[in-house]
């Protein structure tokens, strides 16, 4: 059983997918993390972010592992834990640029599809339901206004003791949205058969409840109660 959750950055996909994976006892694929790891490797090796051929070659030889630890998933690159490094704004922006290239996406496609070998999978990304797993049994598309997503990001930074600039955060989100929605290869859009969820005015618990209700209607049973984490 495969459940895909697509949507823009900051809509709450990470929190929703983590909750669903725990509730159902499914494996979790964070495709955004794969692109972030690719971007991090490119930055570390000073690979030109406009050179599609070099980036694709880099992507083909990445050693990426997802290791469940203490209720979270640690992400390893060549054996090194890069879970925190890939969450910086620099890496996020680089990942959005790297993801526009067809050769890079092709290089990473098989890596993502290999996760389907699990008995159950929650796939978090931007093209999970349209490209990577077009035959998934359940598809969700989670969205929120750019302003609301910027507020969430600003609050996250404040909670970490970081003084963010709201106007800059909003501008960066809008720029990334434009790139993601208008790229020629696998643009961000809901699958025709996806349930659309707008989290702009909803709490995370309300989003999870709506998603679970839809999943239940598809005949999927829950294994145990989930624990929620902040995205």
From Swiss-Prot:
State the CDD domains in the record.
CMPK (cd02020)
> Which superkingdom does the taxonomy of this entry point to?
Bacteria
Principal EC category:
transferase
The answer to keyword Lipid metabolism applying to this record is no
Q: Which GO terms describe its molecular function?
A: (d)CMP kinase activity; ATP binding; CMP kinase activity; dCMP kinase activity
Q: Which GO terms describe its biological process?
A: nucleobase-containing small molecule interconversion; pyrimidine nucleotide metabolic process
Q: Which reaction does it catalyse?
A: CMP + ATP = CDP + ADP; dCMP + ATP = dCDP + ADP
- InterPro entries annotated for this entry? Cytidylate_kin, Cytidylate_kinase_dom, P-loop_NTPase
Q: Name one GO cellular component term.
A: cytosol
Q: Which SUPFAM superfamilies match?
A: P-loop containing nucleoside triphosphate hydrolases
The record's subcellular location field reads: Cytoplasm
Q: Which residues bind ATP?
A: 7-15
Q: Keywords of this protein's UniProt record, alphabetized?
A: ATP-binding, Cytoplasm, Kinase, Nucleotide-binding, Transferase
Q: What is its EC number?
A: 2.7.4.25
Which PANTHER family does the entry link to?
CYTIDYLATE KINASE, CYTIDYLATE KINASE/PANTOATE-BETA-ALANINE LIGASE
Q: Which NCBIfam families match?
A: cmk
What does the similarity note say?
Belongs to the cytidylate kinase family. Type 1 subfamily.
* This protein's name: Cytidylate kinase 1
Name its species.
Answer: Haemophilus influenzae (strain ATCC 51907 / DSM 11121 / KW20 / Rd)
